[in-house]
């Protein structure tokens, strides 16, 4: 899920949920201006984590065309909302680079912030060692879904120690 489509896919009280596994991106409870409902959030925090370990530069190459086309004013507003956590200098620099059309350079600052924040949050997760499964991937690709499903199937066949 991303902040862009989170609100569209979250279940409503009258929606029927699938009975099998549901794969969600590990996110903060608040994504942009949207909050993940409390019960779903608690369930996510207790569930297995399949971490796709993709090189930084590959992820950066992926997000620039995907997010770089979004409305610049909305991107700036989002940066301003996280400016205290990002650091005022980093926020000002990211905004300036964005205004200059240097999207990759701006997003590099933001992705470094995201990674730092995510890893801190991940490593504060209760029972992380038992929940975390790392899957090494070379790039951002639809093939990663196949790799992930193979790894998950193999892990479910592994006897518990």
Short names for language-model regions:
Residues 43-49, 53-161:
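Conserved NTP phosphate-binding and transfer environment spanning the P-loop NTPase/kinase superfamily
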Residues 1-43:
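Conserved nucleotide-sensing/catalytic segment adjacent to the nucleotide-binding pocket
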């Amino acid at each position: 899920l991303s902040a862009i489509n989170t609100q569209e896919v979250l279940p409503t009280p009258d929606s029927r949920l699938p009975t099998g596994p549901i794969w969600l991106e590990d996110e903060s409870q608040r994504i942009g201006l949207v909050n993940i409902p409390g019960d779903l959030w608690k369930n996510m925090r207790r569930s297995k984590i399949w971490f796709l370990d993709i090189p930084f530069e590959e992820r950066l190459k992926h997000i620039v065309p995907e997010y770089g086309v979004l409305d610049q004013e909305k991107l700036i507003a989002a940066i301003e909302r996280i400016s205290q956590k990002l650091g005022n200098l980093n926020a000002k620099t990211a905004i300036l680079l964005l205004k200059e059309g240097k999207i990759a350079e701006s997003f590099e600052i933001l992705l470094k912030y995201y990674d730092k924040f995510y890893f801190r949050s991940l490593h504060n997760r209760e029972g992380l060692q038992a929940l975390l499964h790392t899957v090494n991937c070379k790039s951002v690709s639809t093939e990663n879904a196949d790799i992930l499903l193979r790894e998950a199937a193999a892990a479910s066949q592994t006897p518990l120690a």
